[in-house]
């Protein structure tokens, strides 16, 4: 399980250094590829283990092919999905098209989300986080039904 926020610098070649504490869980020592794709809801990237991505891709493939919204999601997520390998120094090369989509330049954050990481432009992340905290503080609708029995 991946959790926590890690501030990272992308080098001039577009390589992202995976924090040491996650490398074995991601299969870096075994040269198992990771999969990176776009997030269709936010301006960030999603980084999965190959095994976790396969589950998601299988589910995406099961969506109805005559549904325009389903095809759009398939095109975006599967179409942008790229296998990336962890090099000997624990880095992955993020494709230019994906870095451009997420506005990743130098300072980024990796945010653990359980089964995946989100990779954000640091300034964009800080702005969104402040927005979400403000929205949470001013919520008048209350929690969604699914969360009313949830406890921390």
Curated annotation (Swiss-Prot):
Entry GO MF terms: DNA-binding transcription factor activity; transcription cis-regulatory region binding
Key words of the record: Cytoplasm, DNA-binding, Repeat, Transcription, Transcription regulation
Highest rank taxon of the organism: Bacteria
Gene3D superfamilies: Transcriptional regulator MraZ domain (3.40.1550.20)
Residue stretches making up the SpoVT-AbrB domain: 5-52, 81-124
Pfam families: MraZ
Subcellular location: Cytoplasm, Nucleoid
Primary localization class, coarse: cytoplasm
GO cellular component, one term: nucleoid
Entry keyword annotation includes Ion transport: no
InterPro entries per the UniProt record, alphabetical: MraZ (IPR003444), MraZ_C (IPR035644), MraZ_dom (IPR020603), MraZ_N (IPR035642), MraZ_sf (IPR038619), SpoVT-AbrB_dom (IPR007159), SpoVT-AbrB_sf (IPR037914)
BP GO terms, sorted: negative regulation of DNA-templated transcription initiation
Assembly with partners or alone: Forms oligomers.
Similarity comment: family membership: Belongs to the MraZ family.
Name of the protein this chain belongs to: Transcriptional regulator MraZ
UniProt organism field: Legionella pneumophila subsp. pneumophila (strain Philadelphia 1 / ATCC 33152 / DSM 7513)
Lineage: Bacteria, Pseudomonadati, Pseudomonadota, Gammaproteobacteria, Legionellales
